[in-house]
Amino acid sequence: MIVESPYAALLTGTPATKGSVDVLGSTTKFWEYGPVDATTTVIVVHGYRGEHHGLEPVIAHLRGLRIISPDLPGFGESTPLVGHRHDISGYAAWLVEFERAMHLDHPAVILGHSFGSIVVSSAVAGGLVTPKMILVNPIAAPALQGPNGVMSRLTLLYYRAGRALPERIGKSLLSNWLVVRFMSVFLAQSKDPTLRRWIHAQHHRYFSRYANRDTVVEGFEASISADVSMFASKIDVPTLLIGADHDPITTGAAQQSLKTLFPDAQLEILVGVGHLVHYEKPLEAAALIVDFLADGSLA
């Protein structure tokens, strides 16, 4: 059953144009929102097992910015990379080439959510030119350490089992309805039953839109093999960190510690939300983005 987005009406105010470009062997699909002649362009990178729909609630609240939102290679409608692993280095190299393929008149602001925060940080630390960087729910510390280390290891075993089993059984395991629902319940913090129902529907609709088992397992291995703290000291552009006080993936202490590693960063902690800021607090995130960029406006 399709549950209507609580942000659908706002999104109609910034209709999307779909495009396609070949990058490192991936036929990468992307969506553009806002005026093409805007002063500021923002390229947004979604999280693990997500695709471009995930960040649309934030985009729906923004006006006056050109926003380019691709599906990561191997997820959504984008085909996998060719000749590159789906690890942080591979995705960072793809992001550099994707930005170049957009033929922009000026460097784009780069935004990443969750797993996307690692990809973006790696790319910018490696030389991707951007005037500013925004990380939403940044992965601030190693996933195999801290309070969720055991769960991360168990999840890794789950993904590797999904790859090792016969294809039909493995695909069924990796896309299992109960597993997706458990993940969604674990991440959602909102007490609003309507919003929670929509969040769960989003995960069931989009969380299993990946190309093949190798891609999804490589992606998870990448998500736990690196974190933003590994790249922070090499990033000297102004950086906005949008964190959350109930994020089950990254503790408040880890978020505070991450801020100190950047030469020029500000940390804004949203209250009453966890790892799904883009679903549960999109207006607040959009307001922080507009203020940080000193451009655009809220819908």
Give the ranges of each region predicted by the language model.
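Active-site loop/oxyanion-hole signature of alpha/beta-hydrolase fold enzymes
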Residues: 23-26, 31, 69-115, 125-126, ...
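Conserved HGGG/HGGXW glycine-rich cap/lid loop of the alpha/beta-hydrolase fold
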Residues: 26-77
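Short glycine-enriched nucleophile-adjacent loop
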Residues: 117-128, 133
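Flexible "cap/lid" loop of the alpha/beta hydrolase fold
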Residues: 132-168
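Conserved alpha/beta-hydrolase catalytic His-Asp/Glu region
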Residues: 168-233
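Short beta-strand/loop motif that positions the catalytic acidic residue
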Residues: 235, 241-243
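Acidic catalytic loop of the alpha/beta-hydrolase fold
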Residues: 246-250
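Catalytic histidine-centered segment of alpha/beta-hydrolase-like enzymes
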Residues: 273-283
